Amino acid sequence: MMKRQFEDVTRIVIKIGTSSLVLPTGKINLEKIDQLAFVISSLMNKGKEVILVSSGAMGFGLDILKMEKRPTNLAKQQAVSSVGQVAMMSLYSQIFAYYQTNVSQILLTRDVVVFPESLANVTNAFESLISLGIVPIVNENDAVSVDEMDHATKFGDNDRLSAVVAGITKADLLIMLSDIDGLFDKNPTIYEDAQLRSHVANITQEIIASAGGAGSKFGTGGMLSKVQSAQMVFENKGQMVLMNGANPRDILRVLEGQPLGTWFKQIEEVRHD
């Protein structure tokens, strides 16, 4: 049996999706955000370095503007996200402050990490914030990012963004919170006999084929993007845990080595009992 060893993990990227932050009613999940802030603050107090990649700008914007569904018009989508981003960061700042943890905002577009000079600048920004004991909260800059063939600046979704952030910050571990327990061998919402994969050492065609499906009405990420993100993590010699975000305190259990979710780690690096 492969044992998870996270004792030496110092720098952690945690990604939380819209489905974990916004209730099915469209209202903000205040309890979840409070739990997340508590966990991250606890980790910071223990000497860990934590970067939070947070979706939710669209969900927050829809709630504030009392809109029931995402606009189809791109300009309106960007406007709603812009409103929601301010509200989301305001709430994060208030709740983290209760736990005496300071946060900052970093909004990225894909072109920032493509060009060496801007990549160096954003890397330095991360390092400076971390050295000051601040939790960077990262999101895609939805108000200005586009997905045009001649000038693509979108990452696609925040699953991929979290993998990019983990790579450029040389994080020891990416923890991806989802609305599902991990990666299954088939869709658990359709097949009752679906089995959770506890460990994935390689992203095979079989795994890619079984990871179909889209995201929620508030978010964009599906299981396929999570698998593709794991592949990006592997390319950077990193590791990732995909787990259910229903109880953020489970992050602490994962770091203790408990076998929750799916652990993505290349097999040549796995330690055995």
Swiss-Prot record:
It catalyses: L-glutamate + ATP = L-glutamyl 5-phosphate + ADP. PANTHER family: GLUTAMATE 5-KINASE, ISOPENTENYL PHOSPHATE KINASE. InterPro entries: AceGlu_kinase-like_sf, Asp/Glu/Uridylate_kinase, G5K_ProB, Glu/AcGlu_kinase, Glu_5kinase, Glu_5kinase/COase_Synthase, Glutamate_5-kinase_CS. Its main location: cytoplasm. ATP binds at residues 15, 178-179, 220-226. One of its GO terms (biological process) is L-proline biosynthetic process. It comes from Streptococcus pyogenes serotype M1. It is found in: Cytoplasm. Catalyzes the transfer of a phosphate group to glutamate to form L-glutamate 5-phosphate. This is Glutamate 5-kinase. Keywords: Amino-acid biosynthesis, ATP-binding, Cytoplasm, Kinase, Nucleotide-binding, Proline biosynthesis, Transferase. One of its GO terms (cellular component) is cytosol. Belongs to the glutamate 5-kinase family. Substrate binds at residues 55, 142, 158. Pathway: Amino-acid biosynthesis; L-proline biosynthesis; L-glutamate 5-semialdehyde from L-glutamate: step 1/2. Its EC number is 2.7.2.11. It comes from the Bacteria. Coiled coil: none annotated. CDD domains: AAK_G5K_ProB. GO terms for molecular function: ATP binding; glutamate 5-kinase activity.
